[in-house]
């Protein structure tokens, strides 16, 4: 929202009384004299003021019971509404409403009035008739909202789906409406039979005593719902008979998986939705750590958005709440509550005030001759200028993101032979597949119980068979007892059947070999998202909003509000996918929390908003099964790094055939790999020695390590690395280098309070080794990198291609039906977002595909050459690494033109390292097409060549820094108060230009320093800004590239595919016209297959089939069924 104010402006926000009438009269225009009581003197004053001319004030009256008008949500919204320059808010006192005649009520131009218990609706109706103000929520229809029978009648007339119901009216004057026959497991109401379970609702909407009756097969009885009392919202009763007095609605019980959806509209074009635990479930109100009822964020589908539109208009309630039941793939309205606010959502308060203010100003500004027009918000029209000076519309954002900061991953192997382990193995059907994974809390508890029992037995007798594993049993017990509870996402146990026992190859196993069957128990723990990782993800989510239209707007005092408005006004189609690793899923949830300004715990967000993508290998890979190419690569890597001599020129060619600057730099730093490993090993020995000293030192007795780790666990972590890194034959296990780097990076960042010596030296040496080992594990030569990358990423590449091409979902998911979109500004404009959260392997692999898959020709494309030079310098793809693809559409170009669609590619290597590197690689900044255009204006010529990009290089990172260095707000207290700047009035016509950007930058940096005192921030590395790799790719070029990469290996070639339905040579005939279909022509802009009449409401099925690519055979080109399967996931 535009902001126009001075420091002297203060919100005009006061409680009305009889004395206030005179004050209010002074703000009335003379042409409305007949509506208000005036004296001649007051009229003369008004004439003088009008000639001045004065600032006319629109008075908004709040007429409701004090409990409602002075509630926290109402105060929050009115406080924001008062910031409008021309709006003054007056609250009618409850005593005045109840005891004064309507002639003595305060005057207002706009009335917000609504019924609640004790409210005199008749008087409010009389006041509206007397004064004729602009009414936000229709008063007469509020009578009908109080009667569930009338509510259901209106909903039925509007074609809104309801549960099947019948009305029992116990009215002596209408005996035909009171036919009730009750059976053991059913009731018959006026000829309509309802089998148990069914619902019995009083016809009065003010009576919340709703009963649900259960069948005898389920135990009978009933659940009695009521208004929340403390922590209860229902109780179970053994009573199975229906009530015999009063009138009721009987309806079919809808199975909803234990959640109800509550929808809150502000006008027909905005709806906020939340899910809560159904009160019918167990009656226990779920509350979060702050004592608030847990509400789950919800994305409404197209039908639900249309329902919200209809409900708002049918009941003439601008601000309206209603309840949805999601059951059997449908959505049913079961209650309409009238005037209702969301609780505890600052984002909703901001949105509600803004929309109400605009509605009021739009209606009354012309009457008062106020020079006001509804501000054109950046987020209302998602269009950006490009380098060529044209306007392009953001259509799609795809991001692949690595998880946030995590604890070190740890693993322990032990061979077990006790019968209790075999019993557990058999219980979970291990003999069918030869292995089982135990992750659920109940399963882990069983393993812990076995470990405890065996250790007790060891204490009672010296059973040598068990004694051999005592230390490992102790560790198994210690790890499973960590945190005091099982969450199911941070520990797991694998059991593998070994018919002839375990082959003894590791230094940690005994030398003898037994031939009888055994089980290999592998305990994995750690690798969980840290509190710092959650902050990283949430803050990056906030920063991510800035990439969307309106992202630079300053409304509400925080950047990125454009995305939030886009999301809530039905024009954002968002889906978030995550692999099945706990750290990845929690990163996705934290990111979603920041992206959409959600509140509360992460678990409800995870449950409702993050889709698991592990069913088809989209984001997961079986790390236990390496490809033959990976085995060859690892063997060659280990061989080169085991040579006790300085790297030769031949070694440089063998290890870095791609010419990676970062790897060559590390090799120069290492010189002799074995000598460097010797240093690393001695430093680890020193570290374990220091930890033992700390354990014996009383000063460190109560020290609290990061994330509840103890000194004992820290010692075990390093002792195991010390033991495993150097094998019995004196050679080093190179595969342990990533683990060593992982651990020292974690301790340097999080456990610096121990003040261990030489940790930074160990960090530098292990990082140099890891910078060689980690990237090369995904291939050394280009062909190897591509082969391994395809093994990891082919399903994801197919899905990305599908996201860019197939947009039929956009027409049915992310906006209103066109027939109902006439009131929405730019209803066709919408953005599709797909976020994929995954682990390091997929990020490395996808980047390899982009770098080495021949997307562009470096010799001919200077921008791509510079991008490749930048990537060559990047040494590590750290936590929160991002690869972002953005698709724009120019609606002014022909549908078959290659210029219609425009793709941009951006990249960030994620979190910065523990040691500030002065030579940190710097690209050319974040340069979306919109900013390129601004830069071009600064130059004397309009050429958009790459040379110009180099000139503006130094300016761009500053902008990127503001946007993607996300340490700007305190994540713990982010919703402590409204982010709105309270001292300013929100005006209507001032637009923040780029000239104000330096002020915004200063404010963001100032905010950043405020949060630096918080303990968590010292542990959260800032994230490298996004760098633009390319900002002028065509969709055709990207699509053909992705198609070639995703093709089977035998067909894989980087040449353009031959003519097929997905190439420019393919034509189809639609309505007698020949239409050229290109890979760069998504179905969204194809002409309709038959004329659509606007006079008849189109059914959902027809609408979907009209949008579906199945109507145009072969449009997807050579993509196989896997791509279509991934697309089906989006539904």
Swiss-Prot record:
Keyword Transmembrane helix: no
PROSITE patterns: HIS_ACID_PHOSPHAT_1 (PS00616)
CC annotations in GO: cytosol
EC number of the protein: 2.7.4.24
Bias-annotated ranges (Acidic residues): 39-52
Residues binding ATP, per UniProt: 148, 201, 208, 227, 251-254, 260-262, 278, 323, 335-337
Main localization (coarse): cytoplasm
CDD domains the record matches: HP_HAP_like
Region (Disordered): 21-53, 912-951
Polyphosphoinositide-binding domain, as annotated region: 385-456
Regions crossing the membrane: none
Catalytic activity as recorded in UniProt: 1D-myo-inositol hexakisphosphate + ATP = 1-diphospho-1D-myo-inositol 2,3,4,5,6-pentakisphosphate + ADP; 5-diphospho-1D-myo-inositol 1,2,3,4,6-pentakisphosphate + ATP + H(+) = 1,5-bis(diphospho)-1D-myo-inositol 2,3,4,6-tetrakisphosphate + ADP
GO molecular function ontology, one term from the record: 5-diphosphoinositol pentakisphosphate 1-kinase activity
Family the entry assigns: Belongs to the histidine acid phosphatase family. VIP1 subfamily.
Name the record gives this protein: Inositol hexakisphosphate and diphosphoinositol-pentakisphosphate kinase 2
Species per Swiss-Prot/TrEMBL record: Xenopus laevis (African clawed frog)
Gene: ppip5k2
């Amino acid at each position: 929202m535009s902001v126009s104010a001075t420091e002297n402006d203060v919100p005009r926000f006061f409680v009305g009384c009889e004395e206030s009438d005179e004050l209010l009269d002074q703000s009335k225009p003379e042409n409305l004299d007949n509506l208000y009581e005036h004296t001649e003197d007051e009229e003369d004053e008004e004439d003088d003021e009008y000639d001045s001319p004065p600032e006319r004030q629109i008075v908004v009256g709040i007429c409701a019971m004090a409990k409602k008008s002075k509630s926290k949500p109402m105060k929050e919204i009115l406080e924001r509404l008062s910031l409008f320059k021309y709006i003054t808010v007056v609250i009618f006192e409850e005593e005045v409403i109840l005891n004064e005649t309507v002639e003595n009520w305060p005057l207002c131009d706009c009335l917000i009035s609504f019924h609640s218990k004790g409210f005199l609706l008749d008087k409010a109706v009389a006041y509206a008739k007397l004064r004729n103000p602009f009414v936000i929520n229709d008063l007469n229809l509020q009578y009908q909202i109080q009667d569930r029978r009338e509510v259901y009648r209106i909903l039925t007339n509007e074609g809104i789906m309801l549960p099947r119901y019948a009305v029992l009216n116990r009215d002596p004057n209408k005996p035909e409406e009171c036919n009730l026959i009750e059976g053991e497991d059913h009731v018959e109401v006026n000829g309509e039979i309802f089998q148990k379970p069914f619902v019995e609702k009083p016809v009065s909407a003010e009576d919340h005593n709703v009963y649900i009756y259960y069948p005898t097969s389920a135990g009978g009885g009933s659940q009695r719902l009521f208004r929340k009392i403390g922590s209860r919202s229902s109780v179970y009763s053994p009573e199975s008979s229906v009530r015999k007095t009063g009138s009721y609605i009987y309806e079919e019980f809808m199975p909803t998986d234990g959640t109800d959806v509550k929808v809150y509209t502000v006008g027909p074009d905005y709806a906020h939705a939340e899910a809560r635990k159904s009160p019918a479930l167990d009656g226990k109100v779920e509350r979060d750590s702050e004592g608030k009822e847990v509400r789950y964020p919800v994305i409404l589908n197209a039908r639900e958005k249309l329902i919200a539109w209809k409900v708002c208009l049918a009941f003439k309630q601008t601000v309206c709440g209603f309840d949805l039941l999601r059951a059997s793939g449908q959505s049913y309205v079961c209650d309409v509550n009238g005037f209702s606010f969301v609780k505890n959502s600052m984002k909703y308060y901001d949105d509600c005030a803004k929309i109400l203010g605009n509605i009021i100003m739009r209606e009354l500004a012309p009457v008062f001759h106020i020079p006001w027009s509804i501000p054109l918000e950046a987020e209302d029209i998602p269009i950006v200028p490009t380098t060529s000076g044209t306007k392009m519309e953001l259509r799609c954002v795809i991001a692949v993101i690595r998880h946030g900061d995590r604890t070190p991953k740890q693993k322990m192997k032990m061979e077990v032979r006790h019968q209790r382990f075999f019993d557990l193995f058999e219980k979970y059907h291990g003999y069918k597949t030869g292995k089982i994974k135990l992750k659920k809390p109940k399963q882990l508890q069983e393993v812990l119980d076995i470990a405890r029992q065996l250790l007790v037995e060891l204490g009672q007798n010296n059973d040598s068979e068990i004694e051999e594993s005592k230390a490992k049993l102790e560790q198994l017990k210690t790890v499973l007892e960590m945190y005091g509870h099982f969450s199911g996402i941070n520990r797991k146990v694998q059991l593998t059947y070994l018919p002839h026992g375990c082959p003894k190859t590791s230094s940690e196993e005994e030398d003898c070999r037994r031939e009888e069957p055994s089980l290999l128990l592998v305990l994995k723990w750690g690798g969980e998202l840290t509190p710092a990782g959650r902050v990283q993800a949430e803050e990056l989510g906030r920063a991510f909003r800035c990439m969307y239209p309106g992202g630079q707007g300053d409304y509400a005092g925080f950047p990125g509000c454009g995305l939030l408005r886009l999301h809530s006004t039905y024009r954002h189609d968002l889906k978030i996918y995550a692999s099945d690793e706990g750290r990845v899923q929690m990163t996705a949830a934290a990111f979603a929390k920041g992206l959409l300004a959600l509140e509360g715990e992460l678990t409800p967000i995870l449950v409702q908003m993050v889709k698991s993508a592990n069913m088809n290998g989209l984001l997961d890979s079986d790390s236990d099964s390496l490809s033959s190419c990976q085995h060859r690569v690892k063997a060659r890597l280990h061989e080169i790094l085991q040579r006790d001599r300085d790297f030769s020129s031949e070694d440089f060619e063998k290890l870095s055939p791609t010419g990676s600057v970062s790897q060559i730099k590390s090799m120069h730093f290492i010189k002799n790999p074995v000598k460097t490993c010797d240093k690393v090993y001695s430093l680890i020995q020193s570290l374990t020695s220091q930890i033992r000293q700390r354990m014996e030192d009383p000063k460190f007795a109560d020290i609290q390590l990061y994330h509840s780790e103890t000194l004992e666990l820290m010692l075990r972590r390093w002792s195991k690395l010390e033991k495993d890194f150097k094998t019995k034959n004196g050679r080093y296990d190179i595969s342990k280098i990533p683990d060593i780097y992982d651990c020292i990076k974690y301790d340097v960042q999080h456990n610096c309070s121990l003040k261990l010596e030489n940790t930074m030296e160990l960090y530098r040496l292990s990082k140099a080794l890891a910078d060689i080992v980690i990237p090369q594990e995904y291939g050394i030569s280009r062909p190897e990198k591509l082969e391994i990358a395809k093994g990891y990423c082919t399903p994801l590449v197919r899905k990305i291609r599908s996201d860019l091409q197939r947009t039929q979902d956009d027409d049915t998911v992310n906006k209103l039906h066109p027939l109902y979109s006439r009131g929405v500004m730019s209803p066709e404009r919408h953005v599709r977002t797909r976020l994929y959260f995954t682990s390091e392997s997929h990020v490395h692999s996808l980047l390899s595909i982009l770098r080495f898959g021949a997307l562009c020709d470096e010799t001919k494309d200077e921008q791509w050459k510079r991008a490749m030079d930048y990537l060559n310098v990047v040494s590590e793809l750290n936590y929160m690494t991002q690869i972002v693809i953005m698709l724009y559409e120019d609606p002014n170009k022909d549908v078959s033109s290659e210029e219609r669609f425009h793709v941009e590619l951006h990249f960030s290597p994620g979190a910065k390292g523990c040691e500030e590197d002065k030579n940190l690689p710097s690209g050319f900044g974040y340069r979306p097409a919109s900013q390129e255009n601004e830069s071009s204006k600064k130059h004397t010529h309009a050429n958009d060549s790459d040379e110009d990009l180099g000139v503006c290089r130094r300016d761009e990172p500053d902008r990127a820094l503001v946007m993607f260095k996300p340490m700007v707000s305190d994540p713990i207290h982010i919703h402590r108060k409204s982010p709105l700047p309270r001292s300013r009035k929100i005006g209507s016509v001032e637009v923040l230009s780029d000239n104000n950007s330096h002020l915004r930058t200063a404010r963001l940096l100032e905010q950043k320093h405020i949060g630096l005192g918080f303990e968590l921030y010292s542990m959260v590395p800032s994230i490298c800004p996004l760098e633009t790799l390319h900002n002028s790719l065509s969709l055709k070029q990207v699509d053909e590239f992705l198609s070639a990469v995703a093709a089977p290996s035998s067909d894989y070639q980087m040449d353009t595919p031959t003519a097929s339905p997905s190439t420019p040579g393919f034509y189809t005939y639609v309505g007698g016209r020949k239409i050229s279909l290109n890979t760069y022509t998504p179905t969204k802009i194809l002409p309709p297959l038959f004329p659509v009449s606007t006079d008849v409401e189109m059914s959902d099925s027809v609408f979907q089939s009209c949008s579906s690519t199945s109507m145009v055979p072969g449009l997807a080109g050579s993509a196989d069924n896997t791509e279509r399967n991934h697309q089906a996931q989006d539904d």
